[in-house]
Amino acid sequence: MTRPTSPLPSSPRWTGAAPEQEMFQTYSKEEYAVRTNRHYEQPPEFFFPILGGEWNVYSCNLWEQATTDTESQEAKLDLFAKLMHLQPGQRILDVGCAWGGPLVYLCKTYGVTGVGLTLSPTQKWYAEQRAAQHQVDVQILECNWEDFQDNQGFEAVYTDEAIVHFTNLGEFFAKVHSLLRPGGCMLNKECHFTSSRYNQHLTRANVFNHEIFGLTGSYRTLADELMLVDQNGFETRIIHQIDLENYRRTADRWLSNMYQHREQLVALVGDDYYRRFRTYLKLVRKTWNGTKMTLDAVVSYKV
């Protein structure tokens, strides 16, 4: 099976003064894919040494008991399984499955079957290789969630720091509701502003972070998310707040891995992108020193 290759468009940048720019930019599905893939179509060989571990999880992991990248990744995924009450034979959907690590781990460890959605052909290819390597029943689709069709249903649908990219979040929750079997579970782990004041205008640091992801970030307050969950046929049963020290340690590990593998990474993506990504991780680390954001896993059930 041949690994796909695709040309990367130039990195999108804000124009004008940063404080005048707003979040929740609206793009066509085609442009949205191009913008996010400016990041996610970078070589996996760039991301994997940075993220580390067996499962290459590109989001905050849990460090209360863990001493290695793999242990921290598995601790977070085990928490997801506990919150979703996963049982053997169930069917789950990962929206924004990246290179397939979390979905493959959950299927392998908990005896479930899974479907993963990604917009990146390279991520799809690697996720499929990983699923085959671990001999799990996983289907990976290069598909926008809006276009995804399914007639079997799922016991659980989850996202891990993915809904920040969904401008039309209410429509996403309605879609999930239609995909879940009766009594099914939706889990969304995401970063939330502690006040609606913070999502009105962007600081230069915010703007830089959004440039990395093609200007597709749309952070909300937890209250805003819960309102949309309620309006689209769910009842929220668990709000699990994650200690921000876990994100600080995750970012520290990623930065340490970047420095350790600098020569290899620069050879892959060039010095400019290496420096920009390192600056991005430093800003992520700085974000979690403040009080403007929380990190929460929201577990809701279809009613």
Task: Please name every model-derived segment.
Residues M1-F48:
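N-terminal auxiliary segments of SAM/dcSAM-dependent transferases
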Residues G89-G96:
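Conserved class I S-adenosyl-L-methionine
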Residues W99-Y110:
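Conserved SAM-binding loop of SAM-dependent methyltransferases across substrates and taxa
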Residues A127-E128:
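Conserved SAM-binding loop
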Residues Q133-D147:
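Conserved SAM-binding strand-loop segment of SAM-dependent methyltransferases
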Residues D147-V157:
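A short acidic, Gly/Pro-enriched loop at the edge of an enzyme's catalytic core
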Residues G170-C185:
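A short glycine-rich, Lys/Arg-flanked "PGG" loop and its adjoining helix->strand segment in the class I
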Residues H192, Y198-T294, Y301-V303:
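Substrate-binding/catalytic lobe of Class I Rossmann-like enzymes that use SAM or dcSAM, i.e.
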